[in-house]
């Protein structure tokens, strides 16, 4: 539901007011006062709507209206109030008796704007035009720069090395450690890993191959190795004691039991015929 019209507009006049209409409106208001603007046109004998009668009276027919041009004092008041209130022309008109809001608005758009521009002042912000242009050009354009740390060669780490004071043993525990900042490459070069136990226990394997039995020097080498690898080299060691000397000549030459041994020389538990 919209607002109801102020009057029936079917049989109302539109356009400029005539002098006869102005005089009828003045005479009625002087005799009866303003009253209700919706019923006033019919009572005054005017073929106008109530809104048209109200605007005609306030803006043109009031007896307290000032006629003529605006003074310099009124111009300064309008400029000061506009800088504070903006385009609230009805409030500005309240500070200027005899001036209407419509009159002040028209005067602002036709005269005061040009006056402010000639002074180098922006009519909207009431600031100097030069400062407005300089601030607009002086604002730097900040570009969003992204830093990519994914391809950095080495990531920095903080390595805390405990340090003790020989002179003062009663220092606080918070001062016992000092942190040194270094890269991963430097820390790896400074700290050498301890040798693994597997590398210590694994013996060196002799790769010299021979068809015969191992010699006495090779046996001495095997004895000097770690005890943990002795079981592995027991397979290559000759027996410590030979139960009995055995001569091949006993069977080949037909020597009997109890006869004198031959001239064979023993070599590592076996006999070689001379």
UniProtKB/Swiss-Prot annotation:
Expressed in flowers and weakly in roots and stems. Residues 157-201 are annotated as: Disordered. GO terms for cellular component: nucleus. Residues 163-184 have a biased composition (Low complexity). Keywords: DNA-binding, Nucleus, Repeat, Transcription, Transcription regulation. It comes from the Eukaryota. Residues 9-61, 62-116 form the HTH myb-type domain. Residues 37-61, 89-112 bind DNA. GO terms for molecular function: DNA binding. It holds the Pfam family Myb_DNA-binding. It is found in: Nucleus. Its main location: nucleus. Transcription factor. PANTHER family: TRANSCRIPTION FACTOR MYB8-RELATED, TRANSCRIPTION FACTOR MYB8-RELATED-RELATED. This is Myb-related protein 330. It comes from Antirrhinum majus.
